[in-house]
Amino acid sequence: MFRQSIVKQSCRFLATKKQPSIGRYTGKPNPKTGKYTVSFIEGDGVGPEISKSVKAIFSAAKVPIEWESCDVSPIFVNGLTTIPDPAVASINKNLIALKGPLATPIGKGHRSLNLTLRKTFGLFANVRPAKSIEGYKTTYENVNLVLIRENTEGEYSGIEHVVAPGVVQSIKLITQDASERVIRYAFEYARAVDRSKVLVVHKSTIQRLADGLFVDVAKKLSSEYPDIELQTELLDNTVLKTVQHPEAYDDVVVVCPNLYGDILSDLNSGLSAGSLGLTPSANIGHTVSIFEAVHGSAPDIAGQNKANPTALLLSSVMMLNHMGLTEHADKIEKAVLTTIASDAKNRTGDLGGSASTSSFTDAVIERL
């Protein structure tokens, strides 16, 4: 009960202002303006609308940031989807980006743009916090989960082929190097946010070599972190326990291979908020990091002033914390969460309210 009361009182999506020692932001402000430059990928569908909301709120909060528009419309190089050189140069120069939802074009040869971004910039860790919002009632209360997903390999390696008519083989790639960097990041993250356990979620009873390697790497690394307890758990057990008793994981940083993390993180979002429209996300690399809303581009409501900008706003809060701009992060996060908790008229339709994108934005600005 004591821990639950602490969870409920705290509004922060990141439990501390400290950041892991791996993947730290090293960008510097413009010496003339005192502002940092951030690449902004507005995205597709509702992306431009929710991006406009973020820009308005950042302006009202006087955040020392200049946005650099970044077009990642896919191009083909040697038959494969890639990102235009100016976009790559912008993100490599600024070391940080905020990204709205992207739609992957349909057709042979097109690869997910999200996957392309992760590969291009070596974004090895996907950090997904999922936390209840005080004052906004959902089925579960006091959810406070953190999941770190390996972001570059596993079943998402894109290695599959037709063996024979009606038979397809898809290869799950697990490497020691990729496993070590994401697990090490999980330990460092646990230290930074004052969580005492790292939980490796796996299925090594079936995937003895692939998941077995992932678990073995974690066990070897754990000796370097005597202050953090290493635990391991089968995927199906984690799913069951998370649904039954999510509070059991409120002192834990979960880390897992790519596919498991993709599924578990959406489950966590459903438990904490009932909607991906409230879920922030960070993609961390050694030098570059990209923060993104995890929901889709929602073309069915694009241009109708109905989209919920909260996920992108909270992702921008994670970005500000990552940059060390914690006072601005706190101010915006508090304004967003108190707006959602205030009244149904200030919530967008996906949260059972009547607010438009623009009226929600105005309500947040009023609370800054």
Swiss-Prot record:
Its domain of life reads Eukaryota
Catalytic activity reported: D-threo-isocitrate + NAD(+) = 2-oxoglutarate + CO2 + NADH
Alphabetically sorted, this entry's keywords are:
Magnesium, Manganese, Metal-binding, Mitochondrion, NAD, Oxidoreductase, Transit peptide, Tricarboxylic acid cycle
Cofactor binding, note field: Binds 1 Mg(2+) or Mn(2+) ion per subunit.
Residues that hold substrate according to the record: 118, 128, 149, 236
| Single annotated GO MF | isocitrate dehydrogenase (NAD+) activity
Main localization is mitochondrion
Question: Where's the transit peptide located?
Answer: 1-14
InterPro entries the record matches: IsoCit/isopropylmalate_DH_CS, Isocitrate_DH_NAD, IsoPropMal-DH-like_dom
Q: Which residues bind Mg(2+)?
A: 236, 262, 266
Cofactor(s) demanded: Mg(2+); Mn(2+)
Q: What is its EC number?
A: 1.1.1.41
The record's listing under SMART domains reads: Iso_dh
Q: Where in the cell is it found?
A: Mitochondrion
Q: Which residues bear the site annotation Critical for catalysis?
A: 156, 203
Q: Which GO terms describe its biological process?
A: isocitrate metabolic process; tricarboxylic acid cycle
Is this entry keyworded S-adenosyl-L-methionine? no
Q: Name one GO cellular component term.
A: mitochondrion
- Job description of the protein: Performs an essential role in the oxidative function of the citric acid cycle.
Subunit structure, interactors included: Octamer of two non-identical subunits IDH1 and IDH2.
Family as reported in the entry's similarity comment: Belongs to the isocitrate and isopropylmalate dehydrogenases family.
Under which name does UniProt file this protein? Isocitrate dehydrogenase [NAD] subunit 2, mitochondrial
Give the originating organism: Kluyveromyces lactis (strain ATCC 8585 / CBS 2359 / DSM 70799 / NBRC 1267 / NRRL Y-1140 / WM37)
